[in-house]
Regions:
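Residues immediately flanking
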Residues: 27, 49-50
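Short cysteine-rich clusters marking metal-coordination/redox-active sites
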Residues: 13-16, 47
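Surface-exposed loop/turn and secondary-structure junction residues enriched for glycine/proline
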Residues: 30, 45-47
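Short recognition patches in nucleic-acid-associated and regulatory proteins
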Residues: 21-35
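Polybasic, low-complexity binding patches
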Residues: 34-44, 52-96
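A generic structural signal for short, solvent-exposed coil/turn residues
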Residues: 5, 16-19
Length: 96
């Protein structure tokens, strides 16, 4: 499914705007939540550096990862009309 995250673009990094080495990031990780991220459009495009390189890449930087999860939760709640409890039922945790 196409991303529901406002401002996401297929050809540039959601975080820094770079247009090189773009990779798709599933906002909610883990086997089950990765599939749910795909199903509900909770993905963003990131450059390789913002995605997978320490210390700033979201897979290494807790603050950046949490911020994307908060953005994803707000987007899902808006798009699907979910409450915090309904979001938690799907993804197992509240990030707000």
């Amino acid at each position: 499914m196409k991303s529901i995250i406002k401002g996401d673009s297929e050809d540039r990094c959601y975080i820094c705007g770079c247009t090189e080495w773009i990779e798709r990031h599933h906002i909610f990780n883990g086997t089950a939540n990765r599939k749910k991220s795909e199903k509900y459009g909770l993905t963003v495009n990131l450059c390789h550096w913002c995605h997978n390189e320490p210390p700033h890449g979201v897979h290494y930087n807790q603050d950046a990862d949490t911020r994307l999860k908060q953005i994803g939760q707000k987007a899902a709640m808006h798009e699907y009309g979910w409450t915090v409890d309904e979001f938690r039922e799907v993804f197992g945790k509240n990030y707000l």
